[in-house]
């Protein structure tokens, strides 16, 4: 765990050395009394907002703990909740200073932001109608059956599906988990 926290700390130090659009460092913003803007999407259990907008979820707790070890208190942070698909654009548009959320490290995302070391490895899962009438167990089955794959815009499953040959014509991209469930 200590090695893990050090890895997160290195990531955050790198983030703090990156200059914002105005070429002002995050450290100088904090010294001036401005708050660090922690952006996250609603991705339970990774990151979500509590009743008072506070950052909850295990990746938010890790980030806040590392920030505290760096001398940055929770009082020096403010939370910004984004739609999942708005996390990276919000960071790049300077609407947040850092983002959390249990995000997969994808080549396309690395072109737009820096990542910490991975904190876990997760696979994809598919939700199908009761009884799995089309026999869909993987991406190859989606291609074989011609089924429509519903996933979130900006989710890792878009790149994974393409990698396994699912054509864009068989994908429906929606906003987040609620949109996925509604499309089912």
Tell where the protein language model's regions lie, with residue ranges.
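Short, intrinsically disordered, charge-balanced linker/junction segments flanking boundaries
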Residues: 18-23, 176-184
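Glycine/Thr-rich phosphate-binding loops of Rossmann-like dinucleotide-binding domains
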Residues: 46-48, 109, 159
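Acidic, polar ligand-binding/catalytic clefts
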Residues: 64, 77-141
